[in-house]
Amino acid sequence: MTDVEVPQSPGSRVLLVWDAPNMDMSLGSLLGARPTSAYRPRFDAVGRWLLELAGEGVAEACVFTNVTPGSTEVVRPWVEALRNVGFAVFAKPKVTDDSDIDSDMLDHIELRRKEGDLAQVVVASGDGRAFRSPLEALVRDGIDVTVIGFREYATFAQASEVIGFRDLEEIDGVFREPLPRMTLDSLPDEGAWLQPFRSLRSLLEKR
């Protein structure tokens, strides 16, 4: 794992690609429940961080997501909010198990690489199987790579000797409240309560 602060020269591009399905799944697993508004990432804060990272260079922010049949009305406000703060959105129908957007993310990174002005890639994902090898190849080509995500799940980036890593919660303003991240691996000496994932009364609900 390397440091992530890389000053950019004028004309260079810093590209953020955000794997929405993977990040949503990781956050839900971390919380043990569907996140409330306090625990949903603020993309305006992510955008400001990206602009600071790009300096005088070009900052490009893209979110890649799947849209399942029947969910259009639920997803539309979120997509419009992203576009309103300067993020481009690549939306793909989730019609089969093979409708993932990993290959689309890699295709877009490759497109920008071929254009010749790509200085740094920031990938928001914990999917090491899809991204570790291609991202390390970018580093060998002289492009800086940073992964942002949750340290509990983005272990591939932390284990890499050439990929930078930044925990999403370390970026100023991304979360309105601290995430409840107490785990068995991070217990204080005095011990800590681990809250239930659901109400005890849910045992009475019909499955």
Regions found by a protein language model. Give the residues of each.
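Domain-level signal for Mg2+-assisted phosphodiester chemistry and nucleotide/NA-binding surfaces
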Residues: 1-103
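Nuclease catalytic cores that cleave nucleic-acid phosphodiester bonds
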Residues: 73-206
